Amino acid sequence: MDYGPFFDQLSKGEVIAPLPSLTLSAADNTFYRAVTGDQHLLAANSDLYRRVSGGSKELVNPGLIMQISIGQTTNATRKAIANLYYRSVEILRPVEVGETLSTSTVVLGLRDASPKADLNRGKVWLGIETRSGEEMIARYERVALLPCAGDAPGHSDEIPG
């Protein structure tokens, strides 16, 4: 099993190999609601969603869309010491049951961080896009703190936030 890269194994502009796509079901929506208690009105009431939006199916909870998208990027950060923040989060349109999501991740920047207990580490800035077919449905940025396998590589990109 691949446990993800160390900080010093990444390079700016690198595209991280994607994880498998996921087709969303009504059961996914129901399970997400049961686990989180999220009462998003239009995701909970498909009749109301269809009347309000003109959609033809059931709305997938936007929170679930983000959770799936984040989960599809964990191959870049499996070794993360910390997920520092997300920024510029956009969900661009409603997603309905039956759509298949795939997520791509690119390294936007790298910056060495201060060592802690003799462990070299660094911040990785990721650009993330989630699509249904060819259509982008979500995009955002994520910054995580990763350990180095060896010496600090000397990255000094400006990372926002």
Regions found by a protein language model. Give the residues of each.
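HotDog/MaoC-like acyl-thioester-processing domains
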Residues: 1-14, 91, 96-99, 104-161
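Hot-dog-fold acyl-thioester-processing enzymes
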Residues: 1-86, 148-161
